[in-house]
Design a protein with these regions (language model features):
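Class I SAM-dependent methyltransferase SAM/SAH-binding core
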Residues: 55, 61-108
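Conserved acidic residues
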Residues: 52, 73, 116
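Conserved catalytic/acceptor-binding region of the Class I
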Residues: 138-205
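A short, conserved alpha-helix within the catalytic core of class I
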Residues: 127-135
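A short acidic, Gly/Pro-enriched loop at the edge of an enzyme's catalytic core
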Residues: 110-117
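Short catalytic micro-motifs in class I SAM-dependent methyltransferases
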Residues: 122
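Conserved class I S-adenosyl-L-methionine
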Residues: 2-49
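Conserved Class I S-adenosyl-L-methionine
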Residues: 184-271
Length: 271
């Protein structure tokens, strides 16, 4: 359902968009994002025989890493944002899971040992693939990209949601371009020998308030980028759009998590 408003098609533009995730408010709002489908992890683990080391790229506050920590001897959770890794470390301390939190870019990170599994969420879009994937090809046989943490279809209906996105993306200086966004979102696949792709549908209940909060964890709608007044107006309009579809303030969301897995390549394959 979430469709990026700004198509970051150059390295400098991708770096600028990725910098939004260093903001402390974005890190706080990230906790309101829905989870990925639980069945996805069960399926993924069956594709990976080893259980020694895993690496989660662009880990945020540990949405994927903390699940992997239940199954691997060591999980390295890597993110350039101090706010994200601090949030993850604090939550992980309560769970007492064996996650090593590393504040570093994927481009700069080095490891003397390999990994049984490397994972990434939407952070895969912002990486410099020419720098990162040759390292991944030397470290692991399996990379898994996990996406889809907003409902499909939108709870207010696709037509109303598209109109909302088109209007608001324009207001923050972007252009609604779902085709361009989809092309950008799959750019990393040239660096993978894909073994498979599987969609996991599930349902999730979320309050309207938390749904709106989760939007501000995204680069397009971060409060730092929008400014206080515009963000408040965005919240009011989105609340008015969603509230008629809620029961007792709760939305019943139909979700789809998508898993794409395969072998990382040291150079892009011809497409």
């Amino acid at each position: 359902m979430h469709r990026p408003g700004r198509i970051a098609a150059t390295p400098s533009a991708r770096k600028a968009v990725a910098s939004a995730f260093t903001n402390a408010d974005v890190a706080r709002c990230y906790a309101a994002r829905p989870p990925y489908a639980p069945e996805l992890y069960d399926f993924l683990l069956r594709q990976v025989p080893g259980r020694n080391r895993a690496l989660d790229l662009g880990c945020g506050p540990g949405k994927i890493a903390t699940v992997l920590a239940e199954h691997f001897a060591e999980v390295v959770a890597l993110d350039p944002s101090a706010a994200m890794t601090e949030a993850g470390r604090a939550a992980d301390a309560r769970r007492r899971r064996a996650v090593t939190w590393v504040q570093e870019t994927a481009e700069a990170y080095r490891s003397a040992a390999g990994f049984d599994l490397v994972t990434a969420g939407t952070s895969i879009h912002w990486l410099d693939h020419a720098v990162v994937f040759p390292k991944l090809a030397a470290w692991t046989e399996t990379i898994a990209v996990i996406t889809g943490d907003e409902p499909t279809p939108a709870p207010c209906g696709e037509e109303a949601w598209t109109a909302f996105l088109t209007r608001w993306i324009s207001r923050v200086g972007g252009r609604y371009d779902p085709r361009g966004a989809a092309a950008e979102a799959s750019r990393h696949e040239a660096w993978m020998k894909i073994a498979g792709r599987k969609v996991f549908p599930f349902t999730f209940r979320q309050s309207v308030v938390d749904f709106i909060t989760a939007q501000h964890s995204r680069a397009t709608w971060s409060r730092a980028a929008m400014g206080e007044a515009l963000a408040a107006e965005f919240d009011r309009e989105l609340d008015a759009l969603l509230r008629p579809f809620a029961t007792g303030g709760q939305l019943h969301l139909r979700m789809e998590s998508t898993l794409t897995w395969g072998r990382p390549l040291p150079a892009p394959a011809a497409r």
